[in-house]
Regions:
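Conserved N-terminal entry element of GNAT/NAT acetyltransferase domains
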Residues: 1-20
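Terminal substrate-recognition subdomain of acyl/acetyltransferases
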Residues: 3, 148-155
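Acetyl-CoA-dependent GNAT
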Residues: 16-19, 27-83, 88, 108, ...
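Hydrophobic adenine-recognition pocket in adenosine-nucleotide-binding enzymes
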Residues: 17, 90-92, 125
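Conserved acetyl-CoA-binding loop-helix of GNAT-fold acetyltransferases
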Residues: 92, 98-111, 138
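Conserved active-site alpha-helix within GNAT-family acetyltransferase domains
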Residues: 103, 115, 127-146
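Conserved GNAT acetyl-CoA-binding A-motif
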Residues: 106, 113-124
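Conserved beta-strand-loop-alpha-helix junction that forms the acyl-donor binding cleft
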Residues: 122-132, 151-154
Length: 155
């Protein structure tokens, strides 16, 4: 399903992610999120995750035919909460930020959550990403706690 918006001589489209978006996604991850991984790993993860259509949800934003951002959410189910969508990544290329693409991507995820009968959308945002925090608040999200992430690499 596609959403096409024509706004101030810009053609914006929100559509399902596809494998041909791999290089654009890799570049956006590196420049906007700081996760610089290889194209091989990007493609490997996309093959696996795009196939899991009942658990992972991916959409890209195109501006004038070029991938300018994406959102990735997963079904979040726990014993202590009703099901929601959990946004794992929202990334918009730096030169396309502040043009409404992130808002459109989040609205798409909210629509999917509603269509699935879920109670809402949740996400985590890094402590230092103050601009992102301001953005999420501007579109109706509230911060309900602060956390630390613990990580142990085992391989």
């Amino acid at each position: 399903m596609q959403l096409i918006i024509i706004y101030e001589k810009r053609i914006l489209m929100i559509r399902d992610m596809k494998m041909t978006d791999a290089e654009a996604n890799r570049l956006i991850n590196a420049t906007s999120l700081g996760y610089d991984i290889s194209i091989e790993i990007t493609k490997k993860q996309m093959v696996k995750l795009l196939a899991d259509v009942n658990h992972h949800f991916f959409f890209v934003a195109e501006e004038n035919g070029l991938v300018a951002g994406y959102v990735h959410a997963e079904l979040y189910e726990a014993l202590y909460s009703e099901p929601m969508l959990n946004v794992l990544a929202l990334a918009v290329d730096q030169k396309h930020q502040k043009k409404g693409l992130g808002k459109q991507l989040m609205q798409k995820i909210e629509f999917v959550a509603s269509e699935l009968g879920l109670i809402g959308v949740r996400l985590n945002s890094g402590e230092t990403r103050l601009g992102a925090h301001k953005f999420y608040e501007s579109i109706g999200y509230t911060s309900d706690k602060f956390q630390k992430r613990f990580l142990k690499i085992i391989s």
